[in-house]
Amino acid sequence: MQTGPYYFVKNLPLHELITPEFISTFIKKGSCYALTYNTNIDEDNTVALVFMITSRNSPMIVSIDLMELSLNLDSKKYERISWSFKEKKPLKFDFLLAWHNTGSEESTMMSYFSKYQIQEHQPKVTLSTVRDLQCPVLQSSELDGAPEVSCQALELFDWLGAVFSNVSLNNEPNNFISTYCCPQPSTVVAKAYLCTITGFILPEKICLLLEHLCHYFDELKLAPWVTLSVQGFADSPVSWGKSEHGFWKGGEHLYNFVIFNNQDYWLQMAVGANDHCPP
Amino acid sequence: MPAPAATYERVVYKNPSEYHYMKVCLEFQDCGVGLNAAQFKQLLISAVKDLFGEVDAALPLDILTYEEKTLSAILRICSSGLVKLWSSLTLLGSYKGKKCAFRVIQVSPFLLALSGNSRELVLD
């Protein structure tokens, strides 16, 4: 399953994202996303294109609704915004871009931004197999776990982090270096498959991935559950929906699906201290 | 037999994490000194002891991962001890007479957040 491509454009003037041509070619014919590359939201100007352009350099936030703007491109509002981006404050950024085309024509980002050194990238995929992995025992109906029977959802969340960070899971309580161990009760699985996909990935691709995972249990499987974790960019100025995203000690905003073999699921959403509660 | 109606439960936790996790890296100004995991941990303990004393040096601190080649590690500290550990790392200036500094790369109450770092995204 393809999870890309995404694109990188160097020194793209910000006004290029509000031109009538860009809006009609990409915004109106699919879902277009952009994020400035290598800008730290707690230090620099940062721009994101989701359903609107949001620019943030604490404490100033500028939000522009492109769909609303496109309804009247002769308006004074559009003229002012255009003038601001072209002349008053002509900002340029390196952008990551991705586009989900729902139109019938074959417009491409590569040809559209050809004068701006655009590069196409594919998300990096790493696969690994872990043998004899200690896994927490879960019961889909018990989010808080049950003593001696199943683990809490929070314990699973941290355990996933341990697995993906290659943390040792069976340290003795008197070990000087680390006392971390797998939450109990646990079971040992002979083989676990881990897949990491890194890049600027469209939500539509993630939905497809989730669908594939849901179909994993269409046939009888030994595995009791599978998980899909998604991490947002730490320097995105927006989080869930249109909520502003912040970076205090960290810029974490992530979610994790746990899909059980009985078609129950858990959805865990986590945000940092500077973010609003997810919907 | 008809399937039972789907049930839905939403639970919101605020500050649920007992622990905080830090991804750190030790950098030497000139040529480095090799440290194994035990020496690395001892360095962290003595940094906290120098600033806050014996009692706080006994804060539960785990080195979840350690890479000797790059002197980088993922640490786990009880949330109440995060500020003390972080400030101790900030003020540590030398090891065995050699100038060094800790770089704090990521901090989160969620270990899963440390499995990736978008600030380290490199485009080929």
From Swiss-Prot, chain B:
Keyword RNA-binding among record annotations: yes
Keywords attached to this entry: Nucleus, RNA-binding, tRNA processing
Superkingdom of origin organism: Eukaryota
GO molecular function annotation: ribonuclease P activity; ribonuclease P RNA binding
Pfam families cross-referenced by the UniProt entry: RNase_P_Rpp14
Any one GO CC term of the record: multimeric ribonuclease P complex
Entry's Gene Ontology BP terms: tRNA 5'-leader removal
Locations listed in the record: Nucleus, Nucleolus
InterPro entries reported in the protein's UniProt record: Pop5/Rpp14/Rnp2-like, Rnp2-like_sf
General remark: This protein is produced by a bicistronic gene which also produces the HTD2 protein from an overlapping reading frame.
Record's subunit section: RNase P consists of a catalytic RNA moiety and about 10 protein subunits; POP1, POP4, POP5, POP7, RPP14, RPP21, RPP25, RPP30, RPP38 and RPP40. Within the RNase P complex, POP1, POP7 and RPP25 form the 'finger' subcomplex, POP5, RPP14, RPP40 and homodimeric RPP30 form the 'palm' subcomplex, and RPP21, POP4 and RPP38 form the 'wrist' subcomplex. All subunits of the RNase P complex interact with the catalytic RNA.
PANTHER family named among the record's database cross-references: RIBONUCLEASE P PROTEIN SUBUNIT P14
Function: Component of ribonuclease P, a ribonucleoprotein complex that generates mature tRNA molecules by cleaving their 5'-ends.
Family, per entry: Belongs to the eukaryotic/archaeal RNase P protein component 2 family.
Protein name, per record: Ribonuclease P protein subunit p14
